[in-house]
Each structure stands twice: as C-alpha cells, then as structure tokens.
C-alpha cells in the first residue's frame, strides 16, 4: 500500500487592474496582488467600444461623408496587443507579441477549440464584417454555409468584451504555475503595450 501526500486547493479567478489609462498606443502596467499562492491561467479582458453612425455625423452633416463604414481587424484580441511581458523584481522574464500569439494558436489549436477561442478573441462576423450605413445588404457569402448574421444589414459594431488568453510559461500547466508566495519580496508585474 502506497500513501501519497496531497494538499487540498481551490482555483479562483481574481481580476487585476492596470495602472494608467488603457487606450490605443499606450503602455500600461499591472502589479499582481498576492491574493493567492500561485498564478496560473492569465487572460487579458478588453472591452471594445461601440462604433455607430453617430460617430460620423459631423462629417456627414458637413457634406464630407456618407456615413461610417467600419470593421475590426480579423482576430482583434490578438491584434490589439503589440507586446505583453512578465516582470519579476524589475527583471523582464518573458515577452510575447500579438503576432506571435496568432501564429502559435494557428499552429497548435485543434478544430474543436477554434470556435470558442475565436469567440473569446472577437474573431466573429459581428465584429469583422464591415458595417453598412445605408442598411443595404452586406456583401458577403450569403449563399454559403456562413452564419445568418453576416447577411443581416447592420449599421453599427456592438460593444464587446474580449478575453485573450496569454501564453506565458506559467499559464500552460498547473505544475508550472508562478509561485507568488515564494516571491513575496519581489513584485510581479505584467506590462502591456497596446497597438
């Protein structure tokens, strides 16, 4: 008979906030609070604003335009990240780029994971197909197996919250989780450069 020693534990998601104004073209920093012993899966939560026809009303009323044609880039959650890095005690330990995250996921993601991942990062027709200010039919693959919403006339992009999974070494396996309790004399920070 073999007895193995184990410890009960719980996993909880704890939201952390960035210092400074998180906006396009900015660098923000988050100091990880010591609410637990380990840091494991880490996600970036981004809220994309609504883009509607009222944003182009000044140009339209001045006779300079005919409405707002807008769309987010494909894979907006990955595209919004210029780079993200983990810093421990003032020393950069790991750095990743949004482009690298995109390539990595294209190479390693299974077809079963793809649909959920695309929804998390905003790669949906709701965000990536162009809006039509005249409410006319959106030019798209209406006769194919595309989702029905592609062909529905839209004049705005909705406000959407994205959840981008970060791929640091401690996010991949519970055995590699970052031991915050052992780093009590060092600050753990996540630095994010937004495109």
Predicted features along the sequence, with ranges:
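Short, low-complexity Pro/Thr/Gly
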Residues: 1-195
